[in-house]
Amino acid sequence: MPTAPGPEHATDSTTDTAAAVLARGLHLARGARDVVGGLELRIAQGQVVGLFGSNGAGKTTLLQALAGLLPVRQGELRVFGGAAAQARRAIGYVAQGVPDGAWSRLRACDFVASAWQGERWGIGLSPGGRARRAAAVREALQAAAAGHLAQRGMDTLSGGERQRVCIAQALVNPVRMLLLDEPLANLDPRAQLGVLELVRALRDRQGLTVLLSAHDINPLLGLMDSVVYLAGGRGRQGRVDEVIEPGVLSALYGLPMQVARHDGYLFIHPARGFMAEEGGPCHHGGADAPDAHGPGNGHGHDHAHAPAHAPSKDLP
């Protein structure tokens, strides 16, 4: 199973002109609480990057900062060469969770149309504007392999279908980068695979840069060009084999970590001796500390482990 970037998507460190994202000494906060500090990132255009870490480690915070929705507390964050807020129109952002309330009662085509930027400029009020909006919605749904869902109500769609429509909404305006917050959450293995195949197609056919956060690293191993792992207010970017290894993870978490490999899957857990000395994972404290277990437990945290029902290890 490939874990390193292929040559066509390899990171080019010799120049920053090809960087979709560049961060130097980046500090992000939620109110008075520092979330991420001193983060260094360089993501080339056209790459797929996985974002992982414990609950509260800052994954959503980082995605929102990249989307221009959250200010930088300290350091530098550049998106396509400028400030993230200036690049907002070039970014499609899909937040975690599913549409609820009034949004859930819309048809899929109307849900996608609600994000068309022409509405902001008054274009949607004219017959020509309505035609352009309809064309943009149709193209976005087709790009997300969701054209057949256009007339369906959002509340009638499966989890995988809803995720495709949400991605279509992010594509209804011309974008160069997609930010997906937990797009695989609560999806069965077949639906997960469908979303990841869509991400691959958007990268390969449209050259989009894609950052997506996930609880489980394993479904993404054949797709990612690099990984960003956040823990303990710090972060590290690199190839999977550079970041998902005991030395790096121990430094991030501030406690001894191990990485086990079995049948092509990765399991991350505190070192066995540490658990015995400290009385188990309930005693080594903090929101950033992962518990140690295998697949099949009902839980909602962000470190990497094999899924209870493992999806295909290699995407087509």
Regions found by a protein language model. Give the residues of each.
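Conserved ABC ATPase "signature" region
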Residues: 128-149
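ABC ATPase nucleotide-binding domains
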Residues: 246, 252-316
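Conserved ABC ATPase signature
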Residues: 153-157, 161
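Helix-to-loop junction immediately C-terminal to a conserved catalytic motif
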Residues: 67
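Conserved ABC transporter NBD signature motif
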Residues: 75-89
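Catalytic Walker B motif of ABC-type/P-loop ATPase nucleotide-binding domains
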Residues: 178-182
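The feature captures the beta-strand-to-loop junction immediately N-terminal to the Walker
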Residues: 52-54
